[in-house]
Amino acid sequence: AFVVCLPGPVPRKGELLTAVADFWFARLGHIVPNQLTGIDPESVVAADEREQVRGRSVVARRLLPLPIEAVVRGYVIGSGWKDYQATGGICGIPLPSGLKMAARLPAPIFTPATKAAVGDHDENVSFEQAQANCRAALASALAGTGKNGADLCAEARAAAIRLYEEAAAYAATRGIIIADTKFEFGIDGAGTLHLIDEALTPDSSRFWPA
């Protein structure tokens, strides 16, 4: 996925993104809890607003986001390709020499990025920096839970890779390659990790024909 501004709205895009995300939330719910409450969005808005939310909205739990984009890559493309050309790795992860653009990686890798302000680009960071960011940002929220942000970052990495692997395997049976994707995670008051925002949509993933 990359940042591009289209000249006009995409008809029914909200419905598409919601349907795709809901599909993956349901299919991958055994891996990590997610934000969905199961509440019908039409039940929490005024009657004259129901048409606006129908098929394009969810009612989500209030969760505290981790301050990272949890990117998983299965192929060398995009900013990962640029990093590989310059350093021979991606986000500090060494990779085999001689890989071509769009080559499949030996195994999926977790390459976190910062959560940039609106209008700015996310910046790839090392896993160690991602852990430091999570430790600092979540310290007060995790006080008294026995958990810390660095460990939750590691938990998010493991969950993200497993989510990607299962999704990619299923997509392959439908003639689709998921080259890479971006997940976001949040925590509840007990410090339990949840998958939030969207999941494996065209806005957060690269889909290629197999």
Regions found by a protein language model. Name each.
Residues 1-117:
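Active-site loop/lid in soluble adenylation, ligation, and acyl-transfer enzymes
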Residues 44, 151, 189-192:
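Short, glycine- and charge-enriched coil/turn segments that flank and shape catalytic ligand pockets
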Residues 140-179:
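A long amphipathic alpha-helix within ATP-dependent nucleotide-binding catalytic cores
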Residues 106-121, 161-177, 199-204:
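Phosphate-binding core of ATP-grasp and ATP-grasp-like enzymes
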Residues 72, 174-191:
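Active-site acidic catalytic loop and adjacent metal/ATP-binding pocket
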Residues 183-210:
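Catalytic activation segment of kinase domains across protein kinase-like and atypical kinase folds
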Residues 1-4, 101-147:
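Residues forming anionic-ligand binding surfaces in small-molecule and nucleic-acid pockets
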